[in-house]
Regions:
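Active-site neighborhood of phospho(di)ester-bond hydrolases with catalytic His/Asp-centered motifs
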Residues: 348-350, 392-397, 416
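Sec-dependent signal peptide recognition
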Residues: 3-10
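C-terminal motif of bacterial Sec signal peptides marking the signal peptidase cleavage site
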Residues: 16-17
Length: 548
């Protein structure tokens, strides 16, 4: 938000660099799956895929029969189980298919653009979990009316999901002088926003190892017209430090039982939840970093949480992890499409496919075509007056690997690496090819401050021993800092009447940084034997809210 002139030549060069496939020259690692040879239509492998279900993309010529059959089923109030195409239905009969439905439901006012993007051609079919997925895929791929078959690959949060409840008495001082005008009592412990080298956080803490948000808050702290979709676990929309900044759907849909008030649980196909066995508060923690309510006299601050006057950015909960239900390609793609059709301009994604499965952009496009098409659909939507597309931000991953995970590593998306209060990379962060920018993700072990060197944000009391706040670590925690900074940038642009192309704004975001490489010489830290291996591989630098 700092009013400075960007060098257009430099920006265009950077953008060009970011537009190339960041992984094309990377050989497969020993633990990576090789690029698979399939029958041509089968996109990926059944490794780590959901049982009893397959995703297929029909050719356009098959759609009239499918849609007529769907209409006939609707008239009798029965579930669609057959396509109306003999060659396909022979296989569906043999598989004893119990459900056949569009991946992306009929979209009302957005149906025309849905069909223009080809998303209406994706269907998911369900059958007994005992069926052999590979054999079923081979049979379906042999039918002329089917153009692609995709297994439902599972997704993983970019965090160990361990939470450390915040306890004011254990932390000692809960209020201190920090360079900010907000009265949130625990802002002092959010070193990732304002790092004054407090020794209680870590004896190696470095002043300025933060996102430089205090000065940015003097210019803007958010705007309700900017909607950030939290694609994650469910966000606790009743949390006292989040409720005022939750997005409210002006037109809940019958497709979602008129219960999609703040978003939807795509994993369980029901209302948003957060207190089930298996939930960790991951989505609520991420949401708090983006936009916990500022200056409300309680708890913590969010990067774009406003000034306590109802002026924070809005948080939409697009839930893809629910209790013991693990997200997968189907669930995430539906969530992404929902966000695009309901006004989100930033997609906050602290998750990904298990590291090493994809090592190039081409592999991602070829082997996860439905995921790719849904994300590209989001990127094409103009849901914010200040931006001509949707901004997609992913965590780079936590495998300590010299490449970004996917989808984060894809050239059109932003992949976020993680650093700690010592201004050095976190020991778990991925780095190298495909990684774009760094942000605070913390380290809850290995530094002198223990969990206090993690990221402090909102939690669900139901899953964290009654605590509404706590620490977590991971590129999952770094990612929402960049989403929050981007949301601040769009908020400021709206206030100033500025308009940017998606490419222009991404370039601004990736050049509004502080360098880290000068700190990555020969040497070590408590959790990393040689920090020099990260030099030139953490992205363009550390995100800086004031510079944007």
């Amino acid at each position: 938000m700092h009013n400075k002139t960007k060098l257009l030549i430099f920006a265009s060069l950077l953008l060009a660099a970011c537009s190339t496939d960041p992984m094309q020259e990377i050989p497969n690692r020993g633990d990576s799956a090789p690029e698979i040879e399939t029958s041509g239509k089968i996109c990926n492998t059944s490794d780590d895929a959901v049982a009893g279900s397959l995703i297929v993309k029909f050719g356009e010529e098959a759609i009239p029969s499918l849609e007529q059959n769907a209409l006939n089923a609707a008239k009798t109030r029965s579930a669609l189980t057959r396509s109306g195409i003999e060659s396909v239905d022979d296989i569906l009969n043999d598989l004893h298919v119990t459900s056949l439905e569009r991946v992306f439901p009929e979209a009302g006012e957005h149906e025309a653009r849905t069909r223009a993007a080809g998303l209406h051609r994706w269907y998911v079919l369900g059958f007994a979990s005992e069926e052999d997925l590979d054999k079923a895929a081979e049979r379906l791929a042999g039918v002329a009316e089917i153009s692609k078959v995709q297994f439902r690959t599972r997704l993983y949060r970019a965090s160990d999901c361990k939470t450390y409840p915040f306890q004011a008495t254990a932390n000692g001082q809960t209020r201190a002088l920090v360079t900010a005008d907000f009265n949130d009592p625990n802002l002092f412990w959010q070193w990732h926003y304002i790092n004054n080298a407090d020794q209680a956080v870590a004896t190696t803490s470095v002043a300025g190892a933060d996102i430089n948000v205090a000065d940015a808050w003097k210019l803007t702290a958010g705007n309700p017209e900017v909607i950030v979709a939290i694609v994650d676990e469910g966000v606790k929309y009743t949390h006292p430090d989040l409720a005022a900044n939750m997005w409210i759907n002006p037109n809940p849909s019958p497709e979602y039982k008129n219960q999609d008030i703040h978003g939807w649980n795509f994993a369980a196909d029901g209302p948003i939840s957060w207190g089930q066995k298996g939930d960790s508060g991951h989505g609520t923690h991420v949401a708090g970093t983006v936009a916990a309510v500022n200056n409300n006299g309680i708890g913590v601050c969010g990067v774009a949480g406003g000034t306590g006057k109802g002026d924070g950015v809005r948080l939409m909960s697009c839930q893809i992890f629910s209790g013991d239900l693990t997200g997968d390609a189907l669930v995430s793609s539906r969530a992404v499409k929902y966000a695009a059709d309901h006004g989100a301009s930033i997609l906050q994604c602290s998750w990904g496919i298990k590291a090493g499965i994809y090592t190039s952009d081409n592999m991602f496009i070829k082997q996860s075509p439905m995921d790719y098409e849904a994300l590209q659909y989001f990127a094409a939507q103009k849901n914010c007056e200040a931006l001509d597309g949707g901004l997609i931000i992913f965590s780079a991953g936590n495998e300590s690997t010299a490449m970004s995970g996917y989808p984060a590593g894809y050239r059109d998306y932003i992949s976020v690496t993680s650093f700690s209060p010592d201004y050095l990379p976190a020991n778990y962060t991925n780095y190298g090819s495909g990684c774009n920018i760094a942000a605070p993700g913390g380290e809850t072990s290995g530094l002198s401050g223990g969990e206090k060197a993690g990221v402090l944000s909102t939690l669900c009391s139901e899953t964290s021993n009654g605590a509404d706040y706590g620490y977590m670590q991971g590129t999952s925690m770094a990612c929402p800092h960049v989403s929050g900074v981007a949301a601040l940038g769009l908020s400021y642009a709206l206030e100033k009447g500025k308009r940017y192309s998606l490419d222009e704004f991404k370039t601004m975001l990736l050049t509004s940084v502080n360098e880290i490489d000068s700190r990555l010489g020969e040497g070590s830290k408590a959790t990393i034997a040689d920090v020099s291996i990260y030099r030139g591989k953490m992205g363009t630098g550390i995100t800086d809210a004031y510079q944007l």
